[in-house]
Amino acid sequence: MFRPTFNKGSDPKRGQRGFSVIEMAVVLLIIAIVAAFVVPQIMSYMRMYRLGVGGRNVATALQRARYLATSNNTLAGVFVAELQRVDIEQYDPMGKTPPQNMGVVQLPDGVTVASDAPKQIAFDGRGVITPTPKESPTIRLNGIDGYYLFVTVSPTGQVTVSEATRDDRT
């Protein structure tokens, strides 16, 4: 009554089940070819992403230093201590005590501050750069494979981050 019935016409013969080795090899070859094109693009995107994160972190450090200066009506700024580290410092207006470290920004792996970037940018109690520069200070961040971006501070304290671009000369 409930016995399954087999149709002899649809019964696969021995050796005709599953995929052949050639079919599997073709599929693996297609996957390898696609991966050869996609993986470098993903790696390039990740490098640009890390550079963008570093730029936003430096911009945040500058904005925090400006906030410290305006909220405490004192001097505060950022100091590029190393190629991959930016310190946020608050200064004694009288100059009697050393600067207080108010925070540290560690840049992601592979992201460094350019050697020609300003080593220190300070804000006064009004939130403007002191001493007043002739032009807006610009910090260049370098990434891997020639990618770079700029963090620019206007004399009034406005911070902007450029898009990551690639230097084709490298």
Question: What spans do the regions from the language model cover?
Answer:
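Acidic/polar helix N-cap motif
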Residues: 13-15
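N-terminal helix-rich module
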Residues: 1-11, 25-28, 33-63, 67-170
